[in-house]
Amino acid sequence: LSFYTFSYAEGLSYFSDDPNSCMNCHVMRDQFESWNHSSHKAVATCNDCHTPHHNVVAKYTVKAINGFNHSLHFTLGTFPDPIRIKAMNERVALENCRTCHVDTVSQMHASPGGEQADCVACHGNEGHRTIE
């Protein structure tokens, strides 16, 4: 069953940086299309925002966890609608926002509690805007 699922879901494509691999699963079509029409398309692929940059082990660990979860939900038909980002993936994306936009982030002041601003609180749909 695992081999069939991996093969059917084109599992090897998830090891690439090709955004089209996100289209293997029909539930990601809206996210792909909104990225495809966003300003981020010119500067970032799915992996640039959704996988860690600091080391290759962390990158492929996140890809493996997400690949397993996606293939499981795809096979069982249990994806939530609309699909929601998990806490681990939101932390990865936020860190990548801060890495790519370091000049902007460095000019921001921490909150009185010492926490850095949460980019996705205001820009949560960035890269995945609703297409009208």
Residues covered by each model-derived region:
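Short sequence/structural segments immediately N-terminal
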Residues: 1-132
